[in-house]
């Protein structure tokens, strides 16, 4: 790729950001712009005094309540009004008061006594798992099927030999898969972890009320399914350790077979871990591995039948971006199938949020820079432990969401009307290519609804499981506490990229903390803001530079501008992204609507007003564009509905104000008369076809027009929100630019490598506005999105995905429209 391509070459630059309009110095604001030392959240200053006072005196929010819409009966179970007030507890702080003994010797031996008094014994765990799995009907059928394929025309004797051969193979697989839990090993590991965690973590906080709900769930004699977010390898041990400390039996943990290494694998098996393949789909010859799938299914069914607890990581692998990744629902589908066969009466689902000040891996810069992932080995584990002992990784927070009934969730979904099945291509192409007649709004609506009514049971089942997985991950992500490193990294990258005085950073930190609490997210820290900020800066290490200035004897804090440091700061900054993600989407959509009019787009709206309906639809389309970046909203809500609610919050904050009646007179056509030139299909509306015709929605509605506040603090907040999505949108727009030079079919791994090299080169030559836009995660997500919306066709050649342009995007003009669409949201 030559340098001209890096500067966007011959592409129509009238739609591209002008570098002269961007100054990193815009990220730097004085303390006066954030307000005086009253530290009220800036966007709420226009609210009433009473509302502001209640905000400042608010208690910590209690996170993790289940969805009332999908599980109304579970909402009242395991919860009572006193639970939120039970407060936090540091799990690794143990002394003689946590044992039945007192005195000098008890103080010296408190760890040993505490571990010895935990309730763990052999009778808690599954027995005869291997034999029961091998004798299950599904496994027997799979063995017979595989044996028949090995010896299709053989005699009965040869067939018997083939069956025995397959059975031996099945036993070998189960030896790797089936865990043999050892109570003695759990106790020993508990004592070791108590020592280790105290050496490299300041504390591990849990909410006592949440643990009370989990304990109440264990008394139902139903299997529990723990579904945590996945940030670090420590996640595997952390949950088991916490449950052990509270006399709750250890769950069986699904682990990737990359951790099946000598000695370490034995430890994992003894603690309840069982290894599964990272890819279940195919055998080396390209066919489905019927035997392995049957064994895995039988193993999960047997554990649930014996009322064991399971722990599954829905993301499949550790998040390399700091955001909660999209769900991979393979194992979850096995759990749902088990319930549908009436083997067990019900399963209780418990999403789990885990937050670290600093993960023990430190960062994933190597993989984000495109280097291949190193395979785990005993030596790498030993080096990791030694490295951990040399450092302190700050605080950890684990949040257990309210348990909910899987049976109730499935029944509630079956009673809901089947909504339109919209693919990303159906949702976004009308916005990207509005002139395509086949994608007209009305036609898209009818087609999608007919497809949903004619959908097979299997497609509906897959959709149900995918929605369940998204529901769980959204709740787990919402439960994740915001850590001090998350806020400091976010402020340094997206408010003070050129540096800031420590005193101002502390003020802004306090403001951001209040903003987080106001959105019902909890914090993973407490104490004096200055101390907490210094703690975070210390943990961020070489990513932050501290210099002493002569002015007022002040310290000046600057984020490092090297690519690895920016990647690392972005990883921790993404820990706070989900707090503001919907507001950031509205802020970027606000820019898109206003910028379109500034470029002379067709509009009947006065220059100082914007259409709320147009803003909401524009934001809904951006939600679809970013849907590969994680779960943006609950699947029981449409993007249209969530965007509509977020615009309402902007009105509540005072960022947007509703135009006076006189201003709206004669300019607000009914919704039926409006023709958006980039209108999304009607199924994006949150109104159901089954709405009561007597309701207000049965009447003709008139659009609402809004004004944008011009106050400095509101404009600064909008800018901050827009910058949060800056790296994502720059990565997607750069990928769209790269598509202009696409030539011929190319293997997907090769294309990913070329695109990533292009983004890294832009960063190294200071062409990129956001260096963090070049992370490999964003490259993969952008290409996946382009496949989903129909830019690329994907074919398989020798088990390798090959990409080529679809007929829709063969014309250069359509690729240009894709680029223009993404750039319409980009603020520089």
Curated annotation (Swiss-Prot):
Residues 1-87, 119-828 are cytoplasmic. It catalyses: sn-glycerol 3-phosphate + an acyl-CoA = a 1-acyl-sn-glycero-3-phosphate + CoA; (9Z,12Z)-octadecadienoyl-CoA + sn-glycerol 3-phosphate = 1-(9Z,12Z)-octadecadienoyl-sn-glycero-3-phosphate + CoA; sn-glycerol 3-phosphate + (9Z)-octadecenoyl-CoA = 1-(9Z-octadecenoyl)-sn-glycero-3-phosphate + CoA; sn-glycerol 3-phosphate + octadecanoyl-CoA = 1-octadecanoyl-sn-glycero-3-phosphate + CoA. It comes from Homo sapiens. Pathway: Phospholipid metabolism; CDP-diacylglycerol biosynthesis; CDP-diacylglycerol from sn-glycerol 3-phosphate: step 1/3. Changing residue 318 to A: Abolishes catalytic activity. Belongs to the GPAT/DAPAT family. One of its GO terms (biological process) is CDP-diacylglycerol biosynthetic process. It is an enzyme of class 2 (transferase). GO terms for molecular function: glycerol-3-phosphate O-acyltransferase activity. It is a peripheral membrane protein. Residues 435-455 are annotated as: Disordered. The modification N6-acetyllysine is found at residues 780, 784. Residues 442-455 have a biased composition (Basic and acidic residues). Residues 88-118 dip into the membrane without crossing it. Its EC number is 2.3.1.15. The lineage of its organism: Eukaryota, Metazoa, Chordata, Craniata, Vertebrata. The HXXXXD motif is essential for acyltransferase activity and contributes to the binding of the cysteamine moiety of the acyl-CoA and the phosphate moiety of the glycerol-3-phosphate. Mitochondrial membrane protein that catalyzes the essential first step of biosynthesis of glycerolipids such as triglycerides, phosphatidic acids and lysophosphatidic acids. Esterifies acyl-group from acyl-coenzyme A (acyl-CoA) to the sn-1 position of glycerol-3-phosphate, to produce lysophosphatidic acid. Has a narrow hydrophobic binding cleft that selects for a linear acyl chain. Catalytic activity is higher for substrates with a 16-carbon acyl chain. This is Glycerol-3-phosphate acyltransferase 1, mitochondrial. InterPro entries: GPAT/DHAPAT, GPAT/DHAPAT_C, GPAT/DHAPAT_LPLAT, GPAT_PlsB, Plipid/glycerol_acylTrfase. Keywords: Acetylation, Acyltransferase, Lipid biosynthesis, Lipid metabolism, Membrane, Mitochondrion, Mitochondrion outer membrane, Phospholipid biosynthesis, Phospholipid metabolism, Phosphoprotein, Transferase. The modification Phosphoserine is found at residues 380, 688, 695.
